[in-house]
Amino acid sequence: MSYSQQVNKRRTFAIISHPDAGKTTITEKVLLYGNAIQKAGSVKGKGSQAHAKSDWMEMEKQRGISITTSVMQFPYHDCLVNLLDTPGHEDFSEDTYRTLTAVDSCLMVIDSAKGVEERTIKLMEVTRLRDTPILTFMNKLDRDIRDPMELLDEVESVLKIRCAPITWPIGCGKLFKGVYHLYKDETYLYQSGQGHTIQDVRIIKGLNNVDLDRAVGEDLARQLRDELELVKGASNEFDHDLFIRGELTPVFFGTALGNFGVDHFLDGLTQWAPAPQARQADCRLVESAEEKLTGFVFKIQANMDPKHRDRVAFMRIVSGKYEKGMKLKQVRLGKEVVLSDALTFMAGDRSHAEEAYAGDIIGLHNHGTIQIGDTFTQGEDLKFTGIPNFAPELFRRIRLKDPLKQKQLLKGLVQLSEEGAVQVFRPLTNNDLIVGAVGVLQFDVVVSRLKSEYNVEAVYETVNVAAARWVECSEAKKLEEFKRKNEQNLALDGGDSLTYIAPTMVNLNLTQERYPDIQFFKTREH
């Protein structure tokens, strides 16, 4: 197979949803269809049952939430699909945000009983920054749901994206009978209790087929025909160009738990979603068709293998082909590295990659030299842009139960901050360690991982910090004066960047007014 054929058969996507909309269940079922697992695990991991394959960190298993982004690759039809699983819990915006910079399309999962929820709105704002194409799955049809037309209207008005229904539900809850495919003129009948394995679904051709009335009952069949009249008149036709521009989303209905409808959106994904796209670097646009390898690191994860103290950097390949043993330039450090043991993923199971192409995600072993945002090339000096770091909104001081373990604590915190799990600030005037996060759950994650991975017991104390801003100034003299006068409020972050730590928002505003030549940044490029 030629290089361009290899690239064109790849689809790299992420699933976005509000917590509890059924994302982990969908991930499981997608893997089931991709033959990546034989039987879907029970998602919340109750006692002896199988844990969901994509939730493999200790704390995730206990809480039933996906905390870190795993990567799973599987074949489907003629395509090779890379699924990046994003944390579903509302606390995890940074990791999720960066993951969305590494995909070419997204599947939005909506709980049909609840409609569009707050977390979905936030994630959609992120996908808007790059006009990522979106497919939509209306989930939980085996429960009582809101009116399907109402759901489409809500998506259109709240998320500002046009909807084109591809399938349409027949009943819901206990009366859920299946879906009708608007473009194939076929009805797929639902059987309950078949969630763990793939079933043969009965298909009825034609909307006016009498078999349809027999299968779903005359009332539901009549209701379906009436609704479809309305749908065809009131909703948008699917338009591929609008979809690629992120202006229109194809909508599928089903139930992930009942394993029904999942294959319909997978068909849509492989048929319509874009193959790996070009990406902007600081000096030029890099096309996926280029044969020289380029890629960027969007995430670092510690200890994917509890047996080894390792860290893995996740790299999205933008162009070219990875081959075992090849030499690459790590642009930030200006040094050559030999990649002999990159990994491919099936969540938690790792296998060594012999080759990988544009669109694929590979794992690089990292002994502290790779950071989020690093670019790797075959010699060219370029840096991919658009991988952000956010100023945290919540702060705690972290204190050791055993003061002799200061060194391990610092090492653990710096590693966790490079991974993007949390941010660490070391004030210039004392030995405190201040931890900053975007959401409360991150604090729990850090303490639990310090204990299980670094054998360090730590506790939090409140700290008088309301905001952190990265500071820069083009004139060294003015920066020195600023440092001298504000030393009490300055710290270094995990990457040794100078940060202003404000006790109150009023203080921050006053300081910004007092020093107009100093720039205060809320986000910064990695």
Swiss-Prot record:
Localization per record: Cytoplasm
One Pfam family in the UniProt entry: RF3_C
Key words, A-Z: Cytoplasm, GTP-binding, Nucleotide-binding, Protein biosynthesis
TM spans (from-to): none
SUPFAM superfamilies the record matches: EF-G C-terminal domain-like, P-loop containing nucleoside triphosphate hydrolases, Translation proteins
GO biological process, one term: regulation of translational termination
Record-listed GTP binding positions: 17-24, 85-89, 139-142
PROSITE patterns from the UniProt entry: G_TR_1, G_TR_2
Keyword Secreted tagged: no
Protein family according to the UniProt entry: Belongs to the TRAFAC class translation factor GTPase superfamily. Classic translation factor GTPase family. PrfC subfamily.
Protein name: Peptide chain release factor 3
Organism: Histophilus somni (strain 129Pt) (Haemophilus somnus)
Gene behind the chain: prfC
